[in-house]
Amino acid sequence: MSFNEQNSVEHFIVHKLTGINLNAIHNGMVKEDAVPYNDETQWRYIQPDLLPRDVSDVLWEKELKESLCRINPFIASNPERAEEVIHKLRAIIITVGNVGLVRANEEFARWLRNEVSLPFGTNNQHVIVRLIDYENIANNSFILTNQFKIRTREVKIPDIVMFVNGIPLVVGEAKTPVRPAVSWLDGAHDISVVYENSIPQLFVPNVFSFATEGKDIFIGGVRTPLEFWSPWRIENEEEKLSHLLGLHDIAKQLTHLLKPSTLLDILQYFTVYATNSKKKKIKIVCRYQQYEGANAIIERVKDGKIRKGLIWHFQGSGKSLLMLFAAQKMRRQQELGNPTVLIVVD
């Protein structure tokens, strides 16, 4: 068998996240053990032709409706309410051509973070509609598929699409590891320049996208310029040495980034929307050092340590954003009550 980007890197991603070895399929699916996530929920693989959807559908509506009923008792008691929610989500996706991808993505993110209420309560009282169960991760469905064909303005087939409760939150592109002229940048270009313009509806619910050639993995949010895509790494002395020697294990970085708890953590606390110097709306997704640093600060606060920690930064590494991410997550931790966060800048 000759190696190409599909049967090498793409199938490697599927195998590591779900335990399905697509290169070993003959008459049926070969199931192996997926990478353990410390007893967390894992990704489940479904072949793209087995997803019950029309090729123009962004949302997997059957799965989404079941999830809405499972997570929200007031929808389970009246399933027609699920149709009303899905109708509103579809409306956001449709508006992308008018309001732009970043603004549509920001509006959809409010729903994903469970910040929207509807009059579904007693006497038409407004109650929060939960698309995702953040308190019990196992109560959500995590589905991964590959070669996902979608038709909006054009027909495109992203390599990897990852659904949470029937909503596509992650898009990934895999490139060949055996051609020196090809790198993760080619995959990022496909996503940022090609897919986001030809099938923008798929990216309205997007948390982040990733690109890899099997050596490095880079991530970016919607409309992130290629020069601002950032690597995702695991920072410890052993991994740092391995990376310098060219021996780092991409599988560890991949599974760390894409495990369900990390994905939902980034969705809740580690993405922000802002306006740049050109007064243009932008989305910012954390870099790996901001994610690790902010979580380390919060753990020290929870542990009651007097010294909350000192983090060394170089210029342009995103110090202000790290403080913002840490404050954003800290203020939503129930066990911390209502903490006062003091940020000093020079």
Q: Where do the model's predicted regions map?
A:
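ATP-dependent helicase/translocase motor core
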Residues: 2-345
